[in-house]
């Protein structure tokens, strides 16, 4: 499972049965950044539904490779997810995934408003694909 943690959304992607291809699944929304209870609950449901053994969480590094506040929050999210679900967690560099996701969605010919809700799930699929390609 790939997860793109954001301040008000978490994009979710899963692999096919063979673990070869990542597919964007959904974007989980919340009103405030620290209101994560329902987000963790939904991810746990998806973990059970898809038989997930490993979650790849995007790590938003700065362009120089350093970690800022967003990376710290992503790590905290990942640690709490592991505690709540028992699933193994791997952090994956997610630099430039937003630009790549926007480019992919633009190639579909859809208007920006139509793709806004999908971008986080597409970013999660890119994060998961990058992990699969490196491992």
Name what the model sees in each region.
Residues 8-135:
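Phosphate- and other anionic-substrate recognition elements at nucleic-acid/protein interfaces
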Residues 2-4:
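Short glycine-aspartate micro-motif
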């Amino acid at each position: 499972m790939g997860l793109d943690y954001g301040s008000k959304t978490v994009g979710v992607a899963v692999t096919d049965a063979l673990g070869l291809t990542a597919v964007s699944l959904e974007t989980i929304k919340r009103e405030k950044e620290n209101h994560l209870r329902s987000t963790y609950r939904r991810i746990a449901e998806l973990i059970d539904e898809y038989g997930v053994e490993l979650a790849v969480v995007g790590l938003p590094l700065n362009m120089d490779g350093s970690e800022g506040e967003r990376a710290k929050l992503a790590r905290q999210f990942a640690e709490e997810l592991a505690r709540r679900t028992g699933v193994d967690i791997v952090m994956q560099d997610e630099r430039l995934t937003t630009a790549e996701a926007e480019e992919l969605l633009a190639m579909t010919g859809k208007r920006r408003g139509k793709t806004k809700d999908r971008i986080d799930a597409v970013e999660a699929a890119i994060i998961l694909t990058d992990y699969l390609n490196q491992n």
